[in-house]
């Protein structure tokens, strides 16, 4: 194969440098210092009629935030109001330094999220449908871009936009009785909340096409077999087996360095979208952001003194 021209190689290297710089520019110590406190209005005590319950767990679970979808009468379908509440919650959480892990679950037994609210959509003019789907995509993208680990606890039905919501999370766990699928082709449309892009990245292109083309619905065991979820649990009497597993995972994350967790997520996410050489450069740049942190020094000191580290996210 003919060698590339020097100018082309230079342009490629320049492009990689710019990409790495763009990925890591916001990771300096000053960025962590700017983290703000949670916005008012989100606490562990939320009115039961609210469609989204935001709970900041306390004591040994401090740092874990649970977003509980609570729209039983609509099977947790994504309505305009629920999207507005999700957007507001995510906007508040993304800049909160105290947040370490976010769990998305359902407060409604047997349902995670049934997708877009088709009853609401049926009342829309055709000119409203596009912007509504764009809003779903935007909110799901915001969830995917949260800087801390996110876990979807799927204890029930997750169809269409509901599965797309779960696909935006870093880790997915489900009960064996849960049902998951991108079923939009049954309605003569396609997944519009990122499903055509995130499902192939999760399970491979060929299988993703098969599932989307057929609108097939998988149970928890089948989803685990194809790599759609990380863990499958037998459902318990309370109907929250997946949530309990998600909580166990979140507790495993809590002792780790907060800055390191955020930077690791960024390095993985950005690196997966580029070639290996560029990905390694992103890793190097991200690693460099941890060197000057107080947490790194605390980790070394704790190791020397044979005690658990006390990380502050600095």
From Swiss-Prot:
Reactions performed catalytically: (3S)-3-hydroxy-3-methylglutaryl-CoA = 3-methyl-(2E)-glutaconyl-CoA + H2O; (3S)-citramalyl-CoA = itaconyl-CoA + H2O; 3-hydroxyisovaleryl-CoA = 3-methylbut-2-enoyl-CoA + H2O; (S)-3-hydroxyglutaryl-CoA = (2E)-glutaconyl-CoA + H2O
Any Gene Ontology CC annotation: mitochondrion
**Region feature (RNA-binding):** 80-94
Q: Mainly resides where?
A: mitochondrion
List the Pfam families.
ECH_1 (PF00378)
Biological process according to GO = L-leucine catabolic process
Per UniProt, subcellular location reads as: Mitochondrion
Tissue-level expression reads: Detected in heart, brain, liver, spleen, skeletal muscle and kidney. Expressed in brain, kidney, liver and spleen tissue (at protein level).
Q: In which pathway does it act?
A: Amino-acid degradation; L-leucine degradation; (S)-3-hydroxy-3-methylglutaryl-CoA from 3-isovaleryl-CoA: step 3/3
Transit peptide stretch: 1-42
**Keywords of the record:** Acetylation, Branched-chain amino acid catabolism, Lyase, Mitochondrion, RNA-binding, Transit peptide
A GO molecular function for this record?
itaconyl-CoA hydratase activity
Q: What is the similarity comment for this entry?
A: Belongs to the enoyl-CoA hydratase/isomerase family.
Quote the function comment for this protein: Catalyzes the fifth step in the leucine degradation pathway, the reversible hydration of 3-methylglutaconyl-CoA (3-MG-CoA) to 3-hydroxy-3-methylglutaryl-CoA (HMG-CoA). Can catalyze the reverse reaction but at a much lower rate in vitro. HMG-CoA is then quickly degraded by another enzyme (such as HMG-CoA lyase) to give acetyl-CoA and acetoacetate.
Record protein name field: Methylglutaconyl-CoA hydratase, mitochondrial
> What organism does the UniProt record list as the source?
Mus musculus (Mouse)
Q: Per UniProt, what is the name of the gene that codes for the protein in this document?
A: Auh
């Amino acid at each position: 194969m003919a060698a590339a021209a020097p100018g082309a190689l230079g342009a490629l290297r320049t492009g990689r440098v710019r990409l790495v710089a763009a990925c890591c520019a916001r990771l300096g110590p000053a960025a962590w210092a700017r983290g703000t406190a949670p916005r008012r209005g989100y606490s562990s005590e939320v009115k039961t009629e609210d469609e989204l319950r935001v709970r900041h767990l306390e004591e040994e679970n401090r740092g874990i935030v649970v977003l509980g979808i609570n729209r039983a009468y609509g099977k947790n379908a994504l309505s305009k109001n629920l999207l507005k509440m999700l957007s507001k919650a995510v906007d508040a959480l993304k800049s909160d330094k105290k947040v370490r892990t976010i769990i998305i679950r359902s407060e409604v037994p047997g349902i995670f999220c049934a997708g877009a609210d088709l009853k609401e959509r049926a009342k829309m003019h055709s000119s409203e449908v596009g912007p509504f789907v764009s809003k779903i995509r935007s909110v799901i993208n915001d969830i995917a871009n949260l800087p801390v680990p996110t876990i979807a606890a799927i204890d029930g039905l997750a169809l269409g936009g509901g599965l797309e919501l779960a696909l935006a999370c870093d880790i997915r766990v489900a009960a064996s009785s849960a049902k998951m699928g991108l079923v939009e082709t049954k309605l003569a449309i396609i997944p519009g909340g990122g499903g055509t892009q995130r499902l192939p990245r999760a399970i491979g292109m060929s299988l993703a096409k098969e599932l989307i083309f057929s609108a097939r619905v998988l149970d928890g065991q089948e989803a685990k077999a194809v790599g759609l979820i990380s863990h499958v649990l037998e459902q318990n009497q309370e109907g929250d087996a997946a949530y309990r597993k998600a909580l166990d995972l979140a507790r495993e994350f809590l002792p780790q360095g907060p800055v390191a967790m955020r930077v690791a997520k960024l390095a993985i996410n950005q690196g997966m979208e580029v070639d290996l050489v560029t990905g390694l450069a992103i890793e190097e740049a991200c690693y460099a952001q941890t060197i000057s942190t107080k947490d790194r020094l605390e980790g070394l000191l704790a190791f020397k003194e044979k005690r658990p580290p006390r990380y502050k996210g600095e």
